[in-house]
């Protein structure tokens, strides 16, 4: 893996931010799949993708539900068919997980992560995610994408308890513990059809260690 520079923070909670995370070839593969999903009837509402209905009006897909078939004793794994589920293995590189583990004792098990699930989420005009905690998940990784020139405002990742905010810079990724309360500020965009893809994309990975 190419050299990446990470910004590590302990306050107001442990988190790791890496800018320009994916290279050009990886971005091409990611955008190929994002464009495929940004069509009528493909992105689902919260009640259908496992989101918190009272907290968000954004649309998403749980990719693992599409590319893994749980029938019988042995699940059939088609994750390699997905560009995103293939390329985002980069987020679980040993060096990155060790860096996250070293931030604070509450993150020490990140280096032992052996399980993850991934959602693709799209925010267009008027869409948001109210503050919540992913308490069933040990760790989170959010990577952001949008077409340039950028047409929307808002979409920042914010943490009301800490009066803290992180911008959704294009091709950046943030790692943090699942217990941290977080939300997404409302996206505002003018002169843009929902399906032209000029909103805010987030690839959300939920990961940790299971037996």
What does each of the following model-derived ranges do?
Residues 25-27, 114, 127-130, 183-185, ...:
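Short catalytic/ligand-binding loop motif for oxyanion handling, primarily in non-cytosolic enzymes
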Residues 22, 34, 145-146, 207-209:
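Short beta-strand segments enriched in hydrophobic/aromatic residues
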Residues 137, 147-211:
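Catalytic core of Fe(II)/2-oxoglutarate
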Residues 2-104:
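Non-heme Fe(II)/2-oxoglutarate
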């Amino acid at each position: 893996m190419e050299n990446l520079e990470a910004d590590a923070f302990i306050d107001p909670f442990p988190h790791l931010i890496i800018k320009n995370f994916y290279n050009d070839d990886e971005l091409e593969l990611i955008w190929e799949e994002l464009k495929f999903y940004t069509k009528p009837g493909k992105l689902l509402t919260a009640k259908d993708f496992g989101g918190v209905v009272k907290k968000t009006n954004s649309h998403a897909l749980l990719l693992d539900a599409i590319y893994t078939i749980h029938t019988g004793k042995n699940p059939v794994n088609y994750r390699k068919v997905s560009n995103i589920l293939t390329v985002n293995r980069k987020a679980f590189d040993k060096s990155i997980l060790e860096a996250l583990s070293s931030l604070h004792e509450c993150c020490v098990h990140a280096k032992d992560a052996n399980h993850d699930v991934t959602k693709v989420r799209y925010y267009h005009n008027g869409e948001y995610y109210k503050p919540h905690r992913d308490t069933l998940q040990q760790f989170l990784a959010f990577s952001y994408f949008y077409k340039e020139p950028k047409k929307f405002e808002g979409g920042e990742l914010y943490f009301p308890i800490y009066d803290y905010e992180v911008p959704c810079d294009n091709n950046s990724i943030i790692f943090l513990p699942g217990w941290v309360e977080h939300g997404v500020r409302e996206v505002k965009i003018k002169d843009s059809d929902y399906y032209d893809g000029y909103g805010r994309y987030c690839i959300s990975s939920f990961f940790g260690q299971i037996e």
